[in-house]
Swiss-Prot record:
The gene is pdxS. It catalyses: aldehydo-D-ribose 5-phosphate + D-glyceraldehyde 3-phosphate + L-glutamine = pyridoxal 5'-phosphate + L-glutamate + phosphate + 3 H2O + H(+). The keyword Membrane does not apply. InterPro entries: Aldolase_TIM, PdxS/SNZ, PdxS/SNZ_N, RibuloseP-bd_barrel. D-glyceraldehyde 3-phosphate binds at R165. SUPFAM superfamilies: Ribulose-phoshate binding barrel. PROSITE patterns: PDXS_SNZ_1, PDXS_SNZ_2. GO terms for biological process: amino acid metabolic process; pyridoxal phosphate biosynthetic process; pyridoxine biosynthetic process. D-ribose 5-phosphate binds at D24, G153, G214, G235, S236. The lineage of its organism: Bacteria, Bacillati, Bacillota, Bacilli, Bacillales. Pathway: Cofactor biosynthesis; pyridoxal 5'-phosphate biosynthesis. Gene3D superfamilies: Aldolase class I. The keyword Transport does not apply. Catalyzes the formation of pyridoxal 5'-phosphate from ribose 5-phosphate (RBP), glyceraldehyde 3-phosphate (G3P) and ammonia. The ammonia is provided by the PdxT subunit. Can also use ribulose 5-phosphate and dihydroxyacetone phosphate as substrates, resulting from enzyme-catalyzed isomerization of RBP and G3P, respectively. This is Pyridoxal 5'-phosphate synthase subunit PdxS.
Length: 294
């Protein structure tokens, strides 16, 4: 039987990334740029979300060679993505020794009915969520870290803003509920009752919740921190920009000093062009990655 890590240990690893930026990278060179810029971790994958979106087809776990090259190149934690419900991809990444697995809607889901039972793994997991129902279901399955789904690969922050605001509003609503109301809310959200009780008692989610999906500028990163994010994932925004090293450093600084508007103004000067963005309303239903999972 596989050894499993305790929730406290897994969640503690996520807490250590709090306030930081996690960057998508596709090779060792990009990983080094991210580390030098101050990233707290990197996400190793074959293609950034913008390229996955452009290429279409089936997106799978990265070649293990890429993951190992990134792991050997940097001293910061390395994450990697597995398809939703793909037990073997997750086990392979665990065997490779990654620090975290992202059960990710950016990749093509392997199972449209079941997410991974993350409690059975030693390695901790991060999962996306759009609302408190999705957040608590992922936590109940064993996720040690959450992130907004946003709309990956678009360079458009609007969906990440929507998801962060919704989760936070629903947490505030739960905190003000009686136990009787909590049971009904658990039914309405499809959320485990005991988890809602814990959220009511603590006044917050039991795991960290990062912003992800559409972060393209230092101002975007600062905005998400102001809305209550515990940190920021940047997928396509850095290495699809004109000056990745400068963009990476600027986003890290803006995430740390998210209320220092003069600094953010300076960081935003002469960065070059940000990644080309996509208007969400122009996406076809099958192109909306955030709809994947349940």
């Amino acid at each position: 039987m596989a050894q499993t890590g305790t929730d406290r240990v897994k969640r503690g690893m996520a807490e250590m990334q709090k306030g930081g930026v996690i960057m998508d990278v596709v090779n060792a060179e990009q990983a080094k740029i991210a580390e030098e810029a101050g990233a707290v971790a990197v996400m190793a994958l074959e293609r950034v979300p913008a390229d996955i979106r452009a290429a279409g087809g089936v997106a799978r776990m990265a070649d293990p060679t890429i993951v190992e090259e990134v792991m050997n190149a940097v001293s910061i934690p390395v994450m990697a993505k597995a398809r939703i419900g793909h037990i073997v991809e997750a086990r392979v990444l665990e065997a490779l020794g990654v620090d975290y697995i992202d059960e990710s809607e950016v990749l093509t889901p392997a199972d449209e009915e079941f997410h991974l039972n993350k409690n059975e793994f030693t390695v901790p997991f991060v999962c996306g969520c759009r609302d408190l129902g999705e957040a608590t279901r992922r936590i109940a399955e064993g996720a040690s870290m959450l992130r907004t789904k946003g709309e990956p690969g678009t360079g458009n922050i609007v969906e990440a803003v929507r998801h962060m605001r919704k989760v936070n509003a629903q947490v505030r609503k739960v905190v003000g509920m009686s136990d009787d109301e909590l049971m009904t809310e658990a039914k309405n959200l499809g959320a485990p009752y005991e988890l809602l009780k814990e959220i009511k008692a603590e006044g917050r989610l039991p795991v960290v919740n990062f912003a992800a999906g559409g972060v393209a500028t230092p101002a975007d990163a600062a905005l998400m921190m102001q809305l209550g994010a515990d940190g920021v994932f940047v997928g396509s925004g850095i290495f699809k920009s004109d000056n990745p090293a400068k963009f990476a450093k600027a986003i890290v600084e803006a995430t740390t000093h998210f209320t220092d508007y003069k600094l953010i103004a300076e960081l935003s000067k002469e960065l070059g062009t940000a990644m080309k963005g996509i208007e969400i309303s122009n996406l076809l239903p099958e192109q909306r990655m955030q709809e994947r999972g349940w």
